[in-house]
């Protein structure tokens, strides 16, 4: 008998969460006309930044384009992408050498600041820890004019644990 240890247990409210997200996607076009923005966010980490060591040689009559195999390494980058749910197009992209809580918060803050005419933002993401970090929760509460006690990280309130922030 096999037991999978990386697959999380089925959540009792999973179907309700999926229905909420699907409902949001269905309403996105109509609500966008009312000044709301819907974007899906995801990351691509560890992307190698490479540069060809020598320029390509162009095609010539009877010869194909030629490319040398050697390249120069410039480390790796982490990308954060926002896709507009209504249009399906790339709305924003951030490329940095790291992807941490501060990077994600700066990405969200930059996105919101870039379009001040938007009345309400809806960001759809997975539950990666940086997507539900203390700094992001505090920023969202501040931007939403929520006058509530968020509690203390690791001790009480909304900030008590990652699951209480999801």
Report the location of each language-model feature.
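Basic nucleic-acid-binding interfaces
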Residues: 41, 98, 121, 147-148, ...
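A short acidic (Asp/Glu
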Residues: 50-51, 132-137
């Amino acid at each position: 008998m096999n037991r999978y240890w990386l697959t999380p247990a089925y959540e009792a409210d999973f179907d309700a969460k999926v229905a909420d997200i699907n409902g949001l996607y269905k309403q996105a076009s109509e609500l966008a006309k009312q000044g709301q923005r819907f974007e899906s966010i995801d990351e691509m980490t560890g992307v190698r930044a490479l540069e060809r060591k020598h320029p390509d040689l162009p095609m010539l009559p009877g010869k194909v384009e030629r490319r040398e195999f050697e390249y120069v390494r410039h480390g790796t980058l982490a990308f954060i992408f926002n896709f507009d749910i209504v249009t399906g197009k790339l709305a924003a992209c951030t490329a940095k050498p790291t992807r941490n809580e501060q990077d994600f918060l700066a990405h969200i803050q930059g996105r919101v600041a870039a379009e001040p005419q938007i009345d309400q933002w809806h960001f759809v993401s997975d539950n990666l820890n940086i997507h539900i970090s203390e700094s992001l929760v505090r920023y969202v509460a501040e931007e939403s004019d929520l006058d509530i006690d968020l509690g203390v990280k690791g001790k009480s309130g909304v900030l008590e644990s990652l699951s209480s922030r999801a």
